[in-house]
Each structure stands twice: as C-alpha cells, then as structure tokens.
C-alpha cells in the first residue's frame, strides 16, 4: 500500500475541501483525489468557472462530488459546509 493513502478504513473517506473546485486546476485535482481514495467537497462561487467542469470530473472519476455554490468569504455558509462534512484538509484554488 502506498504511503500517499490516508484512507485506511474501509467505507471511510477522508474529506478534502477544494475551494475553486469548478475551475480547471480544482476540477482536475478532484479527479486525482478520488483516484487516490479521498472524497473532495467543492465550494465555488462560479464567478469565473462553470459547474459543468465539476460534472465532467464526476463522470471521469465515476463518483459524486458534493458541491456548494458559495463564496469563501461567506463565513456562515462555509461554517455550514464544515458542519455537514468531516473536512480533514483544504486545498485552496479559489481566486
């Protein structure tokens, strides 16, 4: 087993928040996270991206990716995402 995997318990997925996950880099990162055994959770305000990119990533990866259309400056909305998921890491691609 590779040391890159943190997903050690069957049926348990380490959830990773991906800000800007509908952009080019974020959506491709989601595919790689899933391939490595992680569960991406995406937040994006779609100001310079399209949700379609994330939908394509889901199709490529063969998995659903939770998505929240919020701005990362919205503390209440972001707190709600953290209350719904056990986020263990954050990858910040929002710009």
Q: Which stretches of residues belong to each language-model region?
A:
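N-terminal Rossmann-like NAD(P)+-binding domain of SDR-like oxidoreductases, especially those catalyzing
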Residues: 1-95
């Amino acid at each position: 087993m590779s040391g890159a995997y943190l997903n050690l318990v069957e049926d348990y997925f380490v959830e990773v928040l991906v800000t800007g996950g509908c952009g080019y880099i974020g959506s491709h990162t989601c595919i790689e996270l899933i391939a490595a055994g992680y569960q991406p959770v995406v937040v994006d305000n779609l100001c310079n991206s399209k949700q379609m990119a994330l939908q394509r990533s889901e199709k490529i990866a063969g998995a659903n990716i939770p998505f929240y259309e919020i701005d990362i400056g919205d503390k209440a909305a972001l707190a709600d995402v953290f209350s719904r998921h056990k986020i263990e890491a954050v990858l910040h691609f929002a710009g």
